[in-house]
A protein has these predicted regions:
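A conserved structural/catalytic subdomain of Rossmann-like adenosyl-cofactor enzymes
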Residues: 2-388
């Protein structure tokens, strides 16, 4: 069937098989047959013609023959088999392949192979205007083997964050991240009024009721997760983080990123935050810091790009080394904006020129802050981009 033609992206097993066949110049041609040709399947079928002894004129070439219309209807279908190729149909395909010639789209009527139209039922309501079908054609094209290859580039864009320690962000820290967030919020709503200061998060006398709610509303949770959810340590840790966030908010005061003013420069905010944490006398471990930052930040396409690190090398904006505020830096990548581009292969042009010219003409005009991820390289030729 047709899946071997396109199944699997660049670098996958299927793609590597196709790549080997084409690079070893083993493929002479592919013939597209009509649908409904076989008993058990009605899907499109393709014949691959392989040879390790190509004629000189076929070297580096692949012939594609469109024979999808070369068939007639059977009087009685056999399962999914409804179409049948006649001797003249088969002869046309074999002769076209044998002659290794290009045939522009030609109607079957011109070729003397027009089939008898299938009789439509006259029962029921008929449309006011008859539907005109496009004439059925036959064609053959010849391509270079390299025309079927491409280099898959990974295109990155910078993470842009706004930050503000709002009351809402602080309140959200009472609950752990997924998968605990929604269950904790639901249990807090149900049982918080019954907890005292020294019994906060204690489910020892409420476990049966809590489990009933979890089973009814959060059936996807595993037993281990339920045990963690009903452990007071989790609740106390989250409350402690929330209280730390309140202290940090107070220390930030009226500065950008505090309660009253949003910061659209996360790089500057990190410096401000570091000072506020020190002044508040609190400490955040790595896990707490991540949850805190996630709670107070939102993606904003108009914010400054987030700097990942300062580089000592020269600027190469096409590959992610940007001049920014007097330094050469690498930005954090925004995974949600990551994209891929398939660049057609061209053996007459070096790989670097090929991908750079493509990037500058097809990508930069649309997203001027993008760059090519140079870490994504082909395993065979070690060039940027994965060949497919």
């Amino acid at each position: 069937n047709g899946s071997p033609l396109f199944t699997g992206g660049a670098g996958s097993g299927e793609s590597e098989i196709r790549r080997y066949i084409l690079e070893a110049d083993l493929l002479e041609g592919i013939v597209a047959l009509p649908t409904d040709m076989f008993y058990n399947t009605g899907i499109a079928t393709y014949v691959w013609i392989l040879s390790n002894k190509k004629a000189p004129e076929r070297k580096g070439k692949v012939q594609l023959i469109d024979g999808t219309n070369l068939c007639g209807k059977m009087r009685k279908s056999l399962g999914s088999k409804r179409n049948l190729m006649g001797e003249d149909d088969i002869k046309l395909i074999t002769q076209t392949f044998g002659d290794f010639k290009v045939v522009d789209a030609t109607t079957l009527e011109e070729l003397g192979l027009e089939k008898v139209a299938e009789q439509k039922s006259s029962r029921g309501r008929q449309p006011a205007t008859a539907k005109t079908e496009a004439p059925k054609t036959f064609a053959s094209k010849i391509f270079n083997s390299t025309d079927f290859g491409y280099r898959r580039l990974t295109i990155e864009r910078p993470l842009r964050l706004s930050a503000q320690v709002t009351d809402e962000a602080i309140a959200a820290l009472r609950f752990a991240p997924k998968p605990f967030n929604s269950p904790m919020e639901r249990l807090y709503e149900e049982f918080a009024a019954q907890w005292q200061e020294d019994s906060y998060g204690d489910f020892s006398e409420l476990e049966a009721e809590a489990r009933a709610i979890i089973k009814a509303e959060f059936a996807e949770l595993k037993e281990k997760q339920i045990k963690d959810l009903l452990d007071s340590k989790l609740w106390l840790a989250q409350r402690a983080l929330m209280e730390k966030a309140q202290q940090i908010q107070t220390a930030l005061g009226s500065q950008a990123g505090g309660k009253t003013l949003v910061s659209n420069d996360f790089n500057q905010f990190q410096l401000t935050l570091k000072g506020a944490i020190k002044n508040a006398g609190v400490k955040l471990d790595a896990k707490e810091n991540k949850q805190f930052i996630d709670a107070i930040t939102t993606k904003n396409p108009d914010a400054e790009p987030v700097v990942k690190k300062v580089l000592k090398e020269a600027a190469q904006p096409l590959y992610g080394a940007f001049e920014y505020k007097g330094k050469v830096v690498e930005f954090e990548q925004d995974g949600e904006l990551r994209d891929n581009e398939n660049v057609p292969l061209n053996p007459a042009v070096s790989s670097s020129d090929l991908i750079e010219n493509y990037f500058e003409s097809e990508v930069l005009p649309h997203v001027n802050d993008a760059w090519i991820n140079a870490d994504k390289r082909d395993a065979k030729d070690c060039e940027v981009g994965i060949v497919g």
